[in-house]
Amino acid sequence: MNEEQRKASSVDVLAERDKKAEKDYSKYFEHVYQPPNLKEAKKRGKQEVRYNRDFQIDEKYRGMGNERTFLIKTYGCQMNAHDTEVIAGILEALGYQATTDINTADVILINTCAIRENAENKVFSEIGNLKHLKKERPDILIGVCGCMSQEESVVNKILKSYQNVDMIFGTHNIHHLPEILEEAYLSKAMVVEVWSKEGDVIENLPKVREGNIKAWVNIMYGCDKFCTYCIVPFTRGKERSRRPEDIIDEVRELAREGYKEITLLGQNVNSYGKDLQDIEYDLGDLLQAISKIAIPRVRFTTSHPWDFTDHMIDVISEGGNIVPHIHLPVQSGNNAVLKIMGRKYTRESYLDLVKRIKDRIPNVALTTDIIVGYPNESEEQFEETLTLYDEVGFEHAYTYLYSQRDGTPAAKMKDNVPLNVKKERLQRLNKKVGHYSQIAMSKYEGQTVTVLCEGSSKKDDQVLAGYTDKNKLVNFKAPKEMIGKLVEVRIDEAKQYSLNGSFIKEVEPEMVIQ
């Protein structure tokens, strides 16, 4: 749905504070908001998606934030971190200044994550903690944005129980923030503007990047995979790829600004380019183009095994600035569980992909995601996940207990694996994760590695820390001037999840860029 189509069908949504407690607010969202619905959400590709490269903030909004400050609290994935950079960019363009003091901030935004129940609980706790601030300083604005805002039940809960919130907006209309803020300042009612359908791809949005060493580069929006446990296709919309020329221009600018590493972002980066109707262009082509740009390291996340092509493998195998680290979520090692998850691949096809990757990229580091305790998962099925882990030999994994998300197909399944069983399985899996991580780390002892120094260690300000191209954390002592630089470090000690080493020297960029 493009901007013109939206304007023709949209309605303003304002919920009066004095009536919120008695109403069901879902009816307010008939045009601008719909709850997650698999059948409706799968109706993709018919609405025209336009590319808007002329984004500008209307002059009437500039100066709105003069002598005002803002603070954004961010939960969730790298895409949320990227969105926060855009929100901060818009706020600064309006005249606001960033602050780290929540007690003095004039605008407080909570950028939310809906992927797991635990993340949502943290957000509601955070909103509740802000009630006293709103009471003490009624002129401040408190807003909720991000993926949770795309869920009807969440918006209803905020409207009913959290009257300290002034505005709610979603993932598709961040560029409308100036209008939302103005409405919030002028209205005594809560301002709710949540688009269920994605809009145009908006380029040239201002950004305030976190740091000047590493940068996020969004290459696409949305996801069309509809894994049965996942709310993301509903909260982020259909897959929409940015134009390659826009991405390449952004990466070139980051290289000119001196960034040492970029991460190409998308809910499923391997689907990049499938929706570009005028050209045949995929992630492999994009990586090939970016490999020619003078930026030392290029990563990408997140990958779906179903879309991982041999072309991509070949491009990564050529080396250069594309790092030999692939995060390849498997979720389960059992075919029956994979089928009810809607993952579209089998244990056998996943292992075949891993073999092709290892054959072409012998030095690759593979990491993964795994969900434990999916509905109907038996002990035997879980053990197949453990044996798959052995067979692949992942160097690390992010492991999770299954978390039911309302609106997903899995929410209709009986969650029949007892919590104590889930926790016991997770403990066994994590023991295996630690075992293989230790094996991978031990191979570095006595070796010299190149590390991108990112700053001081979280545990010791006198120690610097950074990551290798395979995403291994390295701690070492060196002059503070090395922060932001690529350095050589000899590894003296391998721990389970990190490495300790001795600084050797700075690495000149031309020694890294191929």
Curated annotation (Swiss-Prot):
GO BP: tRNA methylthiolation
Cofactor note: Binds 2 [4Fe-4S] clusters. One cluster is coordinated with 3 cysteines and an exchangeable S-adenosyl-L-methionine.
Binding-site list for [4Fe-4S] cluster 1: C77, C113, C147
Domain (Radical SAM core) ranges: 209-440
Catalytic reaction annotation: N(6)-dimethylallyladenosine(37) in tRNA + (sulfur carrier)-SH + AH2 + 2 S-adenosyl-L-methionine = 2-methylsulfanyl-N(6)-dimethylallyladenosine(37) in tRNA + (sulfur carrier)-H + 5'-deoxyadenosine + L-methionine + A + S-adenosyl-L-homocysteine + 2 H(+)
SMART domains found in the cross-reference section: Elp3
Occurrences of domain TRAM (ranges): 442-505
Keyword vocabulary terms for this entry: 4Fe-4S, Cytoplasm, Iron, Iron-sulfur, Metal-binding, S-adenosyl-L-methionine, Transferase, tRNA processing
MTTase N-terminal domain boundaries: 68-186
Location of the region described as Disordered in the Swiss-Prot/TrEMBL record: 1-21
UniProt subunit comment: Monomer.
HAMAP family recorded: tRNA_metthiotr_MiaB
Name of the protein in question: tRNA-2-methylthio-N(6)-dimethylallyladenosine synthase
Lineage: Bacteria, Bacillati, Bacillota, Bacilli, Bacillales
